[in-house]
Amino acid sequence: MKFFLDTANVEEIKKAMEWGILDGVTTNPTLISKTGRPFKEVVKEILELVDGPVSLETVSLDAEGMIREGRMLAELGENVVVKIPMTPEGLKAVIALESEGIPTNVTLVFSPTQALLAAKAGASYVSPFVGRLDDISGEGMKLIEEIKTIFSNYEFDTEIIVASVRHPMHVLESALIGADICTMPFKVMEQLFKHPLTDIGLERFLKDWEKVPEKPF
């Protein structure tokens, strides 16, 4: 499973890259606004850092506007993926952009049928929001299972990006189900490293090491 970072914070991206586990980045208008920096300045820096896919979102509600914005975003870098909302107008934009070779990521997906529509429209990626669905139903991961089954049944090439990830269990369950990608906040990625027994074991090893005579280092 690929690990994407859901952020527009360049420092977080740099740290994740140092760990050697970052495969891509997803952003949205909210994450961009939190940086307090000009849009193009932030995006340019991210695209220079990251080799993998970087999702950038359109803000228009009509297909014509999404297509126009999508083309502009695609010009910023070869690895740009255009995020499009799961609406009828959005699917029109997906068809147009994908026909031009511009990859799309259909976002704000909350049902298997929405994901099916996105795949039939030819979207490169689909982003089901598990955390937000858990908030109202507790069935976020069931959604991923159902989408994966549908895509497998009909051999769609659309990749599943598990989004709205709240905690490490979402990451674990995504991997167990076999999702293609999990995009997560930096704090969740950090938590994946942690286990109390790891800390206890390391502390014990270091204490025992101090007892070793004539240590080489």
Curated annotation (Swiss-Prot):
Superkingdom of source: Bacteria
PROSITE patterns: TRANSALDOLASE_1
Catalytic activity, reaction form: D-sedoheptulose 7-phosphate + D-glyceraldehyde 3-phosphate = D-erythrose 4-phosphate + beta-D-fructose 6-phosphate
GO BP terms, alphabetized: carbohydrate metabolic process; pentose-phosphate shunt
UniProt cross-references to SUPFAM superfamilies, sorted A to Z: Aldolase
Catalytic machinery residues: 83 (schiff-base intermediate with substrate)
Keyword Transferase: yes
Cellular location(s): Cytoplasm
Keywords, comma-separated and alphabetical: Cytoplasm, Pentose shunt, Schiff base, Transferase
Gene Ontology MF terms: aldehyde-lyase activity; transaldolase activity
Family: Belongs to the transaldolase family. Type 3B subfamily.
Designated name of the protein: Probable transaldolase
